Amino acid sequence: MAAKDVKFGRTAREKMLRGVDILADAVKVTLGPKGRNVVIEKSFGAPRITKDGVSVAKEVELEDKFENMGAQMLREVASKTNDTAGDGTTTATVLGQAIVQEGAKAVAAGMNPMDLKRGIDLAVNEVVAELLKKAKKINTSEEVAQVGTISANGEAEIGKMIAEAMQKVGNEGVITVEEAKTAETELEVVEGMQFDRGYLSPYFVTNPEKMVADLEDAYILLHEKKLSNLQALLPVLEAVVQTSKPLLIIAEDVEGEALATLVVNKLRGGLKIAAVKAPGFGDCRKAMLEDIAILTGGQVISEDLGIKLESVTLDMLGRAKKVSISKENTTIVDGAGQKAEIDARVGQIKQQIEETTSDYDREKLQERLAKLAGGVAVIRVGGATEVEVKEKKDRVDDALNATRAAVEEGIVAGGGTALLRASTKITAKGVNADQEAGINIVRRAIQAPARQITTNAGEEASVIVGKILENTSETFGYNTANGEYGDLISLGIVDPVKVVRTALQNAASVAGLLITTEAMIAELPKKDAAPAGMPGGMGGMGGMDF
């Protein structure tokens, strides 16, 4: 086992504090509408430019192991906030640094670290309750756009696009962000349920120009096994032909004579038909077939349920107003499923999302939820250069997460003002002087984001903070973008409560642990062994010239 270096007390805390400061100072320059960019070297390709706090935090690795431990602990604040709220990582880092700095001073002055931490926790709980009480629910598309605009660093076009996407696919719908192939940023919305399986044969195409198969008012047969035997299919095909409606077959696979017969019938014009493979794999495939069945009001034909293909009747088939099938995707629009059944299925999937511990499963469940609940929107981010596109994509991701958080828990005045106001409302009392000191640490620390935003804009923070606090209106604050005071909510300068709350809770949690640290252990660097000596000359080689 390698030898370890152990540092205690003040020496350990000073090293750790230095690491915290290095990471926080690199991150906090990005805060606010006038925050600056950070350039990150990449081992290959162009450097990356970003204003995203967590992206900066993840790149910081320090040479000194003790300093690095402090930096990594603070990085955890940014990462955890990003995982929970998806935005507010810079605010969380600034709060973490402020609490650690104030706490370290108090510990150096001889206060008990555990009591300080208890005081910090008391104050944080009160501030969180105050934020939730003051939260304003957002209802209109304009309010959604405002939140998106602020998080995208004042870019109104992005805010508007996110609001439009949310309006079209609903709050449960999936909105993904991709890099565009062009310089324009655009929004594409796919309504209905789409899955990534295309037609099994190009002969099913109804529109040769676009190479898509469009089926209007179609029946849908859902089968979980392979279809290769034509005899079993005949009763269904005959029943559908009588109705002169098109038929879509979704099965594990359709092959052999079954596929050949379907293609021949389609080409002769006797039967409007198309076949696609079922989406997903294994258990996920069964679940997705069930989803499609509920959406279209049909049944999954499965021998597990004792239903044989030969005995299928028309009322077991799903229905949809329109089905569009391309080479890669199938979209089912306006299925005939009962709303109550779809809602029950959505509730069931939400329950599974809460219970699952696997990130992969959660992602798949959320995809299924979106497909059932409304649709999928894709925001394609464009730019003149690859570096610009990547930087913009970071901002769109943040804006999207902030908007979702705002819809969930509501909004408060932005620009750090909500925390600034909360600092004057803390009434918690500690059981001793050290806990009181912990409460005061939070009072001072939660002013840090507002001060940092104004400092980044080149303003004098103390003057502006003083002026804001002189006014008693909850929403009165300072608009750093244009240097004016006013009602921040009506100006559209807002923060999602979930983002502010999560940032504060995570910052206090990690900062509390850092303050109560008394010893640090790190591996000593290995000493390089001395190089081996040169071997002696070989005998019997005299008389040779070199």
Swiss-Prot record:
The keyword Ion transport does not apply. Keywords: ATP-binding, Chaperone, Cytoplasm, Isomerase, Nucleotide-binding. GO terms for molecular function: ATP binding; ATP-dependent protein folding chaperone; isomerase activity; unfolded protein binding. ATP binds at T30, L31, G32, P33, K51, D87, G88, T89, T90, T91, G415, D495. It is found in: Cytoplasm. It comes from the Bacteria. Its main location: cytoplasm. InterPro entries: Chaperonin_Cpn60_CS (IPR018370), Cpn60/GroEL (IPR001844), Cpn60/GroEL/TCP-1 (IPR002423), GroEL-like_apical_dom_sf (IPR027409), GROEL-like_equatorial_sf (IPR027413), TCP-1-like_intermed_sf (IPR027410). One of its GO terms (biological process) is protein refolding. It holds the Pfam family Cpn60_TCP1. It catalyses: ATP + H2O + a folded polypeptide = ADP + phosphate + an unfolded polypeptide. Its EC number is 5.6.1.7. The keyword Chaperone applies. One of its GO terms (cellular component) is cytoplasm. Forms a cylinder of 14 subunits composed of two heptameric rings stacked back-to-back. Interacts with the co-chaperonin GroES. Belongs to the chaperonin (HSP60) family. Together with its co-chaperonin GroES, plays an essential role in assisting protein folding. The GroEL-GroES system forms a nano-cage that allows encapsulation of the non-native substrate proteins and provides a physical environment optimized to promote and accelerate protein folding. PANTHER family: 60 KDA HEAT SHOCK PROTEIN, MITOCHONDRIAL. This is Chaperonin GroEL. It comes from Brucella melitensis biotype 1 (strain ATCC 23456 / CCUG 17765 / NCTC 10094 / 16M).
